[in-house]
Amino acid sequence: MAAVFPVNNSSDRPKPAVLSSDRRIVGATIAVLAKLLSGFTVRWMNCAPDTCQRVYFANHTSHLDAVGLWSALPRELRVLTRPVAAKDYWGKTAWRRYLASSFNAMLIDRHDIKVHQSPVDMMLREIGDIYSLIVFPEGGRNSDGEMGEFKSGLYYLAKKRPDLELIPVYMDNLNRVLPRGEVLPVPLLSCITMGSPIYLEKGESKADFLKRARETVRKLKDS
């Protein structure tokens, strides 16, 4: 089960939109079930829960990742955090769309990206001065547990909003809780580790930044 951490309320930004009562109940139920089924522990390494705007970026191995990471956050942060999720999966049926809306997911179409409809610009427009994000820079899932190369989206988020704290996250064993191709999760123990925030450094190239960001996630695996 996730540990309880005090939350720093370091921001006085506007309040988030209030979800309907049924979606709030479903969202709370999802969080409880995710904790029970994955049995995850949460570690904050040189980092503490905070209501400031952040981008949590993590390795990606399972459809459960977005829900798992969102559920691992304290309740005060969940209402301020929007997971970015694949529209081709979470938008496939009315039931999945409803579930996604209950944890305020932002659905991105990975296969129909247009120049004038940048996913990064959409994310920044949707979060405004209110929400944090959960993203998976690899773009797709890697079921073998090995991290792929990071896509450029994280770099452009950091470049366009340098005020956002970029929090590396390593999710261990969630790919075995909901293996690729499976519908029902398998109860197992897993661990979610949050690391120290990083920022885009002055003069840092896209390639160097993405390599450094990926390495910060990888190091959490061994911490």
Question: What are these language model-derived features?
Answer:
Residues 104-129:
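Helix-adjacent hinge/juxtasegments
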Residues 1-10:
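Soluble, non-transmembrane catalytic domains of enzymes that act on hydrophobic metabolites at membranes
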Residues 195-197, 212-221:
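A conserved mid-domain beta-alpha-beta active-site/ligand-binding segment of alpha/beta enzyme cores
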Residues 53-55, 130-136, 165-167:
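Residue-level preference for the first positions of well-ordered beta-strands
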Residues 22-23, 29-60:
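Helix-to-loop junction immediately C-terminal to a conserved catalytic motif
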Residues 48-112:
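Catalytic core of membrane glycerolipid acyltransferases/transacylases, capturing the structured
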Residues 126-155:
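Catalytic-site beta-strand/loop segments enriched in glycine and acidic/polar residues
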Residues 144-207:
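A cross-family acyltransferase "interaction/gating" segment
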